[in-house]
Amino acid sequence: MPRGFLVKRTKRSGSSYRARPVEPLFPPPGPLAAQSSPEEPGRGLLGSPCLAPPQDDAEWGAGGGDGPGPSPARPAGPELRRAFLERCLRSPVSAESFPSATAFCSAAPAAVTSGEELVPPQVPVSVPIPVPGPAPHGLQRRGKGAPVCASAPAAVRKPKAVRRLSFADEVTTSPVLGLKIKEEEPGAPARALGGVRTPLGEFICQLCKHQYADPFALAQHRCSRIVRVEYRCPECDKVFSCPANLASHRRWHKPRPTPACAASKPPHAPLTPPDPSLATGKENGRVPRTDDQHPQAPDSSGDGQHRDSAARPGLQALVYPEAARPQAPYPEVILGRHGPGSSGASAGATSEVFVCPYCHKKFRRQAYLRKHLGTHETGSARAPTPGFGSERTAPLTFACPLCGAHFPSADIREKHRLWHAVREELLLPALVGAPSEAGPGGASDGSAQQIFSCKYCPSTFFSSPGLTRHINKCHPSESRQVLLLQMPLRPGC
């Protein structure tokens, strides 16, 4: 809040209420005033004490006599008049209303010395205009000299108020990422001055200076000076709005060579050279990703690669038998490992292929093939396809010495032999004195008890409904023929 905002505006001066010694306004007429004039010529102007020595009746005599006056009512004495004037001058109201009482007091004796009678004032005398001079300290603070002092800061602030902001767009970078502002053409219309206001209803683009009738049209306006900056990847044609994003993206295109991949890549180069415009071996390239992007770990069983080279033609053609090999739980022939370039289909591949000997599925890793072989072990005993031949299938699997069924592992074969032992114990009383069984799926021609054997597995049942339930549950119709092809006819026990 500014200083003096709530101060009551009056004409009162800022002088204090302290009474100052002043000269008496009306010195006594007569010889006393005449005597004081020659003795003290400058006392009336400089000011003197207002209280004079008491002189009662000598002042009012016509000829200066001591007798009483002719009037029956004695006029007021000079002391009473002086006390009245002093009381009026000492009051706060008169001190504030008449700040120039000193000048009035100094001018009054000069008028009285001419010999006029003293008359008490009936009407308040108008305040004379004070002569400009050194004002009191209080008046200097609150006087009208304050605007003079404030004019110096106003002169300093004047250039700031006069300064006009220039809105000419010299910036060529947009705050929106990926946008750039073109430089203004020399022939473009200049913008109106800051003092000139555009009429209402006109909306002007600040860049191209086009005017529109409503703000919606201005918002939909596509300025010709705003250009979209695109940073395109030279290898995959992806577009980015920031060069840093493009640099981060291009790191994915860097090749990832490994010593093993570099050693095996020259002999297995592709037959047709790739297009030089397309990126090869890139993760985001348009060509299909090859296996070199994530090279396989070197196989620890690579020492037997040349040893299997003679077996590959037999496995691919499925016609020629293979030489016998020592039996093992998972021999290398079962894994069906094929090196690169073993056939026309795998000529372009740079990784090894592992073929399952039962279903001829191909796998890239040996671990995948081992996991797949576990699915063949879960079912009943199954032999390879007849195309392999009995000579070829014997060393590949574990054959049952009783019925000739082949199994991929010794554990499954032992379970199968347990079925033979249980069946012999059950059928021994019924087969005593009876001829041999008619066939694998028939019933024995013996006496009371009849035996039903499954055609697809070595399971045996004593009733036809039990065999039917077993066939419907364990050998569904879609896989019966496949199982029949894989399962050779076994001789009767």
Swiss-Prot record:
Lipid metabolism recorded as keyword: no
Location of this chain's protein in the cell: Cytoplasm; Nucleus
Annotated region described as Disordered, given as residue ranges: 1-77, 248-310
PROSITE patterns named in the record: ZINC_FINGER_C2H2_1 (PS00028), ZINC_FINGER_C2H2_2 (PS50157)
Up-regulation conditions: Up-regulated by NEUROG3 and NEUROD1.
Disulfide bonds, paired cysteine numbers: none
Alphabetically ordered keywords of this record: Cytoplasm, DNA-binding, Metal-binding, Nucleus, Repeat, Transcription, Transcription regulation, Zinc, Zinc-finger
Basic and acidic residues compositional bias, start-end: 283-294
Chain spans, region SNAG domain: 1-20
Chief localization: cytoplasm
Gene Ontology molecular function, alphabetical: DNA binding; DNA-binding transcription factor activity; transcription corepressor activity; zinc ion binding
Organ and tissue specificity: Expressed in spleen, stomach, liver, kidney and testis. In the pancreas, expressed in islet cells, including insulin-producing beta-cells, but not in acinar cells (at protein level). In the brain, expressed in the neuronal cells of the cerebral cortex, the Purkinje cells of the cerebellum and the hippocampal region including CA1 and CA3 (at protein level).
Record flagged with keyword Metal-binding: yes
Biased segments, Pro residues type: 267-276
Function: May function as a growth suppressor or tumor suppressor in liver cells and in certain neurons.
PANTHER family: INSULINOMA-ASSOCIATED 1, INSULINOMA-ASSOCIATED PROTEIN 2
Protein name: Insulinoma-associated protein 2
Lineage: Eukaryota, Metazoa, Chordata, Craniata, Vertebrata
Gene field: Insm2
